[in-house]
Swiss-Prot record:
InterPro entries: PHRF1/Atg35, Rubredoxin_Fe_BS, Zinc_finger_PHD-type_CS, Znf_FYVE_PHD, Znf_PHD, Znf_PHD-finger, Znf_RING, Znf_RING/FYVE/PHD
Annotated S-S bridges: none
Organism whose genome encodes this protein: Komagataella phaffii (strain GS115 / ATCC 20864)
Name this protein carries in UniProt: Autophagy-related protein 36
Compositional bias ranges of the Basic residues kind: 255-264
Keywords: Autophagy, Metal-binding, Zinc, Zinc-finger
ZnF (PHD-type) residues: 85-131
Length: 463
């Protein structure tokens, strides 16, 4: 087996350089660089005094540091290794039958360190590596405290605890919040009086800020609430055939609102009544009045007396009564399949030709496609014959190719090719997709519209 250099882990070809006295071989450059930093052998960690490279002998300076340790420091380091609980340091199982180390104070089971029950056998501590004889068992912490290690532990522990207590006291006594126990009763009384004066001053300032105008506004609001409550109670006893005109409804809503100028109220009532009185007669409901009263009471603590108040209009009544909502027609939109037919048969062939001829870039292609598609969708929605044509194309697709619309449309490059379309499955001419004369005229007109749109967009790009 080839020997390798322990420094660079490469194969040793020429064994020329070695250390003395351990006689371990290395590369010349490797051992020289190693010697600049340490004089211990990389393999066995023994100190060497010189190295031999062939016939050359190089002396090595001792680079080990001399350590001057204090006994108290050693005892404190030793203290950290002492087991403070009756636990085995290897299996961490509590037991009263333990053996302890004289050097580090670690506790172990007899079976864990492999000495059995022989009292005169030697054993090695797994923690500190100290060889020692079996001296006895450590059943509790009192046995450890009887040794020199226990005495040193007590001395170091007392010093550390004293220093820790003093530092904690100093850190807490320097904080203002921790000096509260040093204050007298007179100090507490002075602090309470200062806070009471500040609270009284703030309350006086808030009470002075309330003006006389606000007091009058509050009074008017209370009167409006009282009148609204009376009207709501009287409406509960009214019959179902009682019909209230729109003008009276506005007057009832005006009583529930905040005070405003009379001129603005009259003008608003005339405009609202003239626009809606001739069209419909509204019937007030008790739920509407109760909702408005609850809404007014909820905002009564912080009212804002402005002219932009919510009025009792037809729209407000419709939001409470679903039977009064107007039937607003929904705007018709194209389906996804119809949009695909328009793109594949009308727009894509033209844009594809421009893109293949390098007239349009990729970004321009996408942008123009969006613009033309949106405009053409609106054109198709406005013409019923064009919509009928789209439905006919989708019916042919469903009969012949099921749900694969793109595969069906990939066979054509223009909408006119559907007129001559034949299928082997049907073995006959399909007339559902063919256009009549009016549809052909409309779709041809769409072709001219698309060409005009393309010319305009290309002109914008060039300019």
């Amino acid at each position: 087996m080839e020997e390798v250099c322990s420094i660079c882990l490469e194969v040793l070809v020429d064994k020329e350089a070695f250390t003395e006295p351990c006689l371990h071989y290395y590369h010349n450059e490797c051992i020289k660089e190693w010697t600049k930093r340490a004089n211990t052998c990389p393999k066995c960690r023994r100190d060497y005094s010189q190295i031999r490279i062939g016939e050359e002998v190089i002396s090595v300076k001792n680079r080990s540091l001399e350590l001057h340790l204090v006994d108290e420091t050693l005892e404190e380091t030793r203290e950290r290794l002492i087991s403070y609980t009756n636990l085995c340091a290897l299996c961490e199982d509590p037991s009263t039958s333990l053996i302890y180390c004289e050097s580090c104070g670690g506790s172990f089971h007899f079976n864990c360190i492999g000495i059995g029950d022989e009292l005169d056998s030697e054993w090695c501590c797994p923690l500190c590596g100290m060889f020692q004889n079996h001296l006895g068992e450590a059943s509790n912490r009192n046995l450890i405290s009887a040794t020199p290690v226990g005495e040193g532990r007590r001395r170091v522990t007392s010093i550390v605890n004293t220093r820790r207590t003093n530092s904690i006291y100093r850190s807490h006594s320097n904080r203002p919040a921790q000096r509260a126990h040093l204050m007298t009763d007179s100090d507490y009384t002075m602090i309470v009086d200062q806070h009471r004066e500040k609270l009284l001053e703030s309350q006086l300032q808030e009470s002075n800020t309330q003006s006389s105008g606000e007091e009058e506004s509050w009074k008017l609001l209370d009167e409006a609430l009282k009148s609204g409550t009376q009207n709501s109670q009287s409406s509960e006893f009214s019959t179902e055939n009682n019909v209230v005109p729109l003008k009276n409804t506005h007057e009832l809503g005006r009583k529930l609102k905040k005070p405003r100028r009379a001129s603005g109220i009259k003008k608003n009532v005339v405009e609202r009544s003239s626009s809606h009185q001739s069209t419909q007669i509204l019937k007030p409901s008790s739920s509407l009045i109760s909702d408005l009263l609850l809404e007014t009471r909820g905002n009564s603590r912080h009212p804002s007396f402005t002219n932009s108040t919510q009025k009792l209009t037809v729209e407000a009544l419709q939001s409470h009564d679903p039977t009064l909502k107007l039937n607003i027609p929904k705007t018709e939109t194209l389906s996804l399949d119809q949009k695909i037919v328009i793109q594949k048969l009308f727009i894509k062939p033209r844009l594809r030709n421009l893109y293949d001829s390098n007239t349009l870039s990729k970004d321009n292609y996408i942008e123009i496609n969006k613009i033309i598609c949106r405009r053409l969708y609106d054109k198709f929605l406005q013409d019923q014959l064009a919509l009928a044509y789209l439905k006919q194309v989708l019916e042919v697709k469903e009969r012949l190719h099921g749900h694969d619309l793109k595969q069906f449309l990939a066979q054509f490059t223009h909408w006119s090719e559907l007129n001559d379309f034949t299928d082997d499955k049907w073995q006959k001419q399909e007339t559902e997709g063919s256009c009549n004369h009016k549809q052909t005229q409309i779709l041809s007109m769409f072709d001219s519209i698309i060409d005009t749109m393309l010319q305009n967009e290309l002109h914008k790009l060039l300019t």
